[in-house]
From Swiss-Prot:
<dbReference type="GO" id="GO:0006364">
    <property type="term" value="P:rRNA processing"/>
</dbReference>
<dbReference type="InterPro" id="IPR014001">
    <property type="entry name" value="Helicase_ATP-bd"/>
</dbReference>
<feature type="compositionally biased region" description="Basic residues">
    <location>
        <begin position="37"/>
        <end position="58"/>
    </location>
</feature>
<protein>
    <recommendedName>
        <fullName>ATP-dependent RNA helicase dbp-3</fullName>
        <ecNumber>3.6.4.13</ecNumber>
    </recommendedName>
</protein>
<dbReference type="GO" id="GO:0030687">
    <property type="term" value="C:preribosome, large subunit precursor"/>
</dbReference>
<keyword id="KW-0694">RNA-binding</keyword>
<dbReference type="InterPro" id="IPR001650">
    <property type="entry name" value="Helicase_C-like"/>
</dbReference>
<dbReference type="Pfam" id="PF00270">
    <property type="entry name" value="DEAD"/>
</dbReference>
<feature type="domain" description="Helicase ATP-binding">
    <location>
        <begin position="210"/>
        <end position="394"/>
    </location>
</feature>
<comment type="similarity">
    <text>Belongs to the DEAD box helicase family. DDX5/DBP2 subfamily.</text>
</comment>
<keyword id="KW-0067">ATP-binding</keyword>
<keyword id="KW-0698">rRNA processing</keyword>
<dbReference type="GO" id="GO:0016887">
    <property type="term" value="F:ATP hydrolysis activity"/>
</dbReference>
<keyword id="KW-0690">Ribosome biogenesis</keyword>
<keyword id="KW-0547">Nucleotide-binding</keyword>
<dbReference type="GO" id="GO:0005730">
    <property type="term" value="C:nucleolus"/>
</dbReference>
<feature type="domain" description="Helicase C-terminal">
    <location>
        <begin position="435"/>
        <end position="584"/>
    </location>
</feature>
Amino acid sequence: MSSTKKHSRSEGEEKDARLAKKVKTDETPVDGEVKKERKKDKKEKKDKKEKKDKKSKKEKKDQDESPATESTEDVSMPDAAAEPVADKKEKKEKKDKKEKKDKKEKKAKKSDESTTEESTSASKATTNGTTTPAASTNGAYTYKQADALSALPESEIETFLKEKEIVIKDPSSSNLRPIMNFSQLPQSNLISKNPFAAYTNPTPIQSASWPFSLSGRDVIGIAETGSGKTMAFSLPCVESLASRPKPKFNSRDRTAHPRAVIVSPTRELAMQTHAALSGLASLVGLSAVCIFGGSDKNEQRNLLYKNNGVDIITATPGRLKDFLSEGSISLANVSFAVLDEADRMLDRGFSEDIKLILSGCPPKEQRQTLMFTATWPLDIQKLAESYMINPAQVTIGHRTRAGGDGEGNGNIELQANSRIEQKVEVVDPRGKEFRLYELLKEAQKGSQKDDRILVFCLYKKEAVRVEQFLSRKGIKVASIHGDLRQDQRTRSLEAFKSGTTTVLVATDVAARGLDIPEVKLVINVTFPLTIEDYVHRIGRTGRAGKLGKAITLFTEHDKAHSGSLVNILRAAKQPVPEELLKFGTTVKKKAHDAYGSFYKDIDPNKKATKITFD
């Protein structure tokens, strides 16, 4: 009995111990339960996310693959079988991309072929001489030859070219006919304004160059001074810009974006070119600005930004470089570039400037480049052609070529204006100023007292001295040279043009390109440094088809130029004084920086003397 109680008591104690143990186990720290709950939540979230991703993938596949059977199979496929489907989709995307690329390439090829066919047909039409589409490098506008011009017989065209002494060298063989009168110009908004009402017919350089420049071609124009070269490039410049929409720029942008740039070697020539060009531009709503050294930069900047930017800039190289370097001007939108007096622009003093300016423009394939000049040395030709694409070369006057390859590819020899009567007087250096005074009094006698006379000196100090000497003699005289401020130079030039002052003393700064009307006489007090400058000096008279006269006072100090001067006189069929021949006819042509080369002017008709030995 007692053992039974003892056994039951031990069982009860074990039961209590188990219950206590269970309670103790259930009462474990709460942290463990929290961790379990967190793990459980994370697992549930992960499962939900995976289900959501699978669902989105399934919907995407349903959209990409239309057959319903494939969609059903995809749902039932396990994860291991989903990989081939993804690969299949990737391959399909690659295939679609490849097909699109092939279509794009075929389309581009087709457009290239059509462009080639159009250009071929255009060239054929040009050759036939019926209609003349543009052979434009930039394709901005076209030139259609007038029906009346196309209808003219070829013999009449040849007679015109011969009479006007026009020689055209065209690498493209486009057979463009010269525009012989203004009615043959293609109709446009500008031409409808009748801008040439004051003129009778185009000058030879305008007549021959316009068909090429209006076609968008690059052009080299070589003609004597006073032949109308300024209008030869002004008309195609304005027509080119007027046919294109003007790009819009941010009004807050303090950088001018011109579409055309004309570069001139001197301030005076730049101002003169701007005056002619702006007259045409204003007729079709284009703006033009002239920038040059010696004037206030801020005023010129304000002109550049006025009216939402400028369309055409006429500039001297120095001031244009300044504005480019400071960011006031960007040439990135230039489609029309002109180098006026190109031989001087590309000569040693300006060649680096021109390279800098043209490098700021679009490539030569994307712009039209024109160069006009009175002289065109061979080395400058090669340099200039690197800026142009197949330029058409128009030469006015019977200019022979020295050297070359026998096909007219040598250097174009310099020639003076044949309408200018040239006279050379060999004088004592100490008596030049008194002889100048005598010539002026003789030239301004009677009814000729108001004739305008241009007097050239070599140095600035000499110009000041001559001006003071003539002023003391009672002659109304003004001067223009590098030591004067720009406003003083402009005032002197305007006084001479208006006739207030009848005598203008100038250095060579005024020799290049200035169009001063009604200059009756040019007097060279001192011979210039080069024969080219001599031709430009005397070219200030006899302009626009009129007659002129030039007198040169030659001294023993100038004898190095006697040979070149004799050749110029003979080519123009002018008398050569015996006193000048005494200085010799040797012509120095620079071939080496240190030594040079000397060539003697030999009469080809003179027979050699046979030498016999006993």
